[in-house]
A protein has these predicted regions:
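Short, Lys/Arg-rich flexible segments
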Residues: 1-151
Length: 151
């Protein structure tokens, strides 16, 4: 094969097109990955083990709070936290974020304490375990994206 300026230019053009295809596929896979984590978080909250012995009524209302057992995701009372779990994806930068859009005090502070615990509360992690549980699916999605992009 003879190498000349025209063949090098065509090779570079093909490489750039392949890169663009791979990045497009990765962006789609990233969105699916974030949706997978979101779904796992929401399901883990729905299925969490609760501690009936420590139930109480919140804020002088007739809404019972049944706390989750330590080292389990937060329990669902009203569904506000579970509904607030969302994700955003920047397909151009290939970055995704998954988490709660609630950051109003005191709820935002509680979410951090729930994940890591505090001096008065054992951890009730929900972000990290859901992400770890989703890792194999995410790896497969990303692998598939790269393969689809280079076809």
């Amino acid at each position: 094969m003879k190498v000349n300026e025209e063949s090098v230019a065509e090779f570079v053009k093909n490489l750039q097109m392949t890169q663009q295809k791979v990045e497009t596929q990765l962006g789609k896979a990233l969105a699916k990955s974030c949706a997978t984590i979101q779904r796992e978080i929401q399901e883990s909250m729905r299925d969490t083990e609760i501690d009936i012995s420590k139930s109480y009524y919140k804020h002088n209302k007739n809404i019972p709070h049944h706390p989750s057992m330590p080292y389990n995701p937060p329990a669902v009372d009203t569904g506000t936290l579970r509904r607030s779990i969302t994700y955003t994806v920047d397909e151009k930068e290939l970055v995704g974020y998954v988490g709660s859009v609630i950051n109003d005090p005191p709820y935002g502070l509680y979410l951090e304490k729930a994940e890591y615990g505090s001096s008065r509360m054992k951890p009730r992690p929900w972000l990290k375990p859901a992400t770890e549980k989703s890792l194999e699916t995410i790896k497969e999605l990303l692998k598939g994206a790269v393969k689809a992009g280079i076809k």
